Amino acid sequence: MVYDLDMLKAFYASFEKKIGRVRAVLQRPLTLAEKILYTHLYDDAQLKNYERGEDYVNFRPDRVAMQDATAQMALLQFINAGKDSAAVPSTVHCDHLIQAYKGAGPDIATATETNREVYDFLRDVSSRFGIGFWKPGAGIIHQV
C-alpha cells in the first residue's frame, strides 16, 4: 500500500488532541521533532518527559520505507523475527545502488545486472511478506 488516505485522515484528525496532551504533560512548547515523535508513541501511557541518552522509548510508525542498500539487513532481521507480515505498510525502494554515470537507461541496466542477487532477494522477500517493492528505475525514495 503506497498511499493510504484513510490512514492520513485518521492521523491528522487526532493530531491536535495528541499534541495538546503532550503540551499539558511537558508544560512547554514542542519542537517539530518532538511533535512527530510524541504522536507516534507505541502506547499513550508512555507520555512523559524523556531524557536524551537516558530513556528508551517505543514508537509505532505509520509506515516503513526502506532503500535497497540497507533493506537487506532489515529484511533478514524481519525474517528471523518469525513474523508473517509487516505490522505497518512497508516498501522497499531500489534507488541507492544505482550509480549515475552514463544516463538513466544505461545506469539502470548496469545496476540491475551488478546488483541482480540483491534485487532478487529484496523482490522475493517483499512478495512473500506483503511488502511493496519498487524496482530499479521506478523512482527515488527521497530527493537528493
Model feature map: region roles:
Residues L8-F11, F15-V144:
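Long, structured ligand/cofactor-binding scaffold of large enzymes
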